Amino acid sequence: MSLKQITISTLRQWKLANKKFACITAYDASFSRLFAEQGMPVMLVGDSLGMTAQGHSTTLPVSVEDIAYHTKSVRRGAPNRLLMADLPFMSYSTWEDACKNAATVMRAGANIVKIEGGGNWIFEIVQRLTERSVPVAGHLGLTPQSVNIFGGYKIQGREQSAAARLIENAQQLEKFGAQLLVLECIPESLAEQITKTISIPTIGIGAGKHTDGQILVMHDALGITGGRPPKFAKNFLSGAGDIRTAIQRYIYEVEQGLYPAEEHSFQ
C-alpha cells in the first residue's frame, strides 16, 4: 500500500488550515504497519515503552538503546509516516550527550527527537540540535521524566504563575528552533492559549480539544492499560470489533473534533 509521505511541513500546513490530526505511540513493526494502513499520520516511539512494554512503574529506566531498537522496528512498518522518538531520561543533560544520542535515534529512523521541559539549558540544546539539522519537538506540562520533582503524575499549569511560565517556555522553544510542541495534562484553556500564541503545531495529551493534534499511548487507545486508565484516555476498541476499526474511529474523532470531549479534559 502506497502512502503519502508525512513531514513536519505537512503538520504546519494542517495547522494553518485548522485541520486536526491524530498521533499514537508505536513500539513494533506490526502495529506501526497497521496504524499506517489506517491513515495514522504521526507515530511516537515514546519512553512510555518503559511502562507499557517493559513493565516499569516510570519511564526513567528506558535507555537510548531501547528507543533506537524500537524506532528501527516502527520505521520498518511505517516508512512514510512522521516518526518522533523520545530522548529518554538523562540522555540530553549535556550537549555532548544530546548530540550523540540524538544522532543515534535519528540514524535508527526518527524524523524528529522529543525532549522534555523548559529553561535556558533546554533552549540551548534545542538550538544547537536544530543548527545541526536535527529537528526537535518540545514537551511541556506534565513531563514524565520529572515525576520525582512533581511528586507524581499531576496536572500542571493551574496556578497563574505556572501557566505564565508554560506560555513563556512554549514561546522560547519555538524561538530556539523547536518544530513541534507536545502539551501534556494542562488545563484546556491554557493549551488553547499556547496553541494560538505559537506558530508551530501543538500535540495534546490530556490538554483538551484545542491543540492542533492529539496523541494517545496505544495501550490507552485500545483499552489494554493495566489498572485505572488516565482521565484523558478513551478506549476506542470498545464496541469497535477489531483494532483496525478502533484506530479508524480514533483518527476520525480527532479530525472531527469529537475527541477529546469535555470528560477527557482538565479545566
UniProtKB/Swiss-Prot annotation:
GO biological process, any: pantothenate biosynthetic process
One Pfam family recorded for the sequence: Pantoate_transf
Entry annotated with the keyword Isomerase: no
Enzyme category, top tier: transferase
GO cellular component, one term: mitochondrion
Annotated keywords: Pantothenate biosynthesis, Transferase
Protein name listed in UniProt: Probable 3-methyl-2-oxobutanoate hydroxymethyltransferase
Organism expressing this protein natively: Schizosaccharomyces pombe (strain 972 / ATCC 24843) (Fission yeast)
